[in-house]
Structure formats: structure tokens, C-alpha cells
Amino acid sequence: MTKEIKVKVQLVRSPIGTQESHRATVRGLGLRGVNSVSELQDTPAVRGMINKISYLVKVI
């Protein structure tokens, strides 16, 4: 079996005042409040979402 590669993302800045599409991306990654952490599969789609809101999140 192959081991799935995971990536942990932490919301470090509030999405208040950002574009609606960026807030939707934050919700799509499973992040709620500031400092919330979500563990996701490392796929190109997830990487693209992280890149889009890189100023709001930190990869840990």
C-alpha cells in the first residue's frame, strides 16, 4: 500500500475583509477560526488553494 502524503495548514490571519472567493477557499480547506488547523491530502488542487490564500495561512 502507498502512504498518502498529508499537509497541515493553519489559519494565521482572519479572512474578514478579504475577497469572497478567498473566504470560500478558507472554508473549503476546512479552516474555521484563527489558529485552526486542518490536515489535508497533498494534491495539486489543495496546493493551489493554499497558494491562493498564502497570506492567510501557514503550512506546518
UniProtKB/Swiss-Prot annotation:
GO biological process, one term: translation
Any coiled-coil regions, as ranges: none
UniProt GO molecular function: structural constituent of ribosome
GO CC terms in record: cytosolic large ribosomal subunit
Keyword Ribosomal protein: yes
Entry keywords, A to Z: Ribonucleoprotein, Ribosomal protein
Subunit structure: Part of the 50S ribosomal subunit.
Family designation: Belongs to the universal ribosomal protein uL30 family.
Protein name: Large ribosomal subunit protein uL30
Lineage: Bacteria, Pseudomonadati, Pseudomonadota, Betaproteobacteria, Burkholderiales
Gene: rpmD
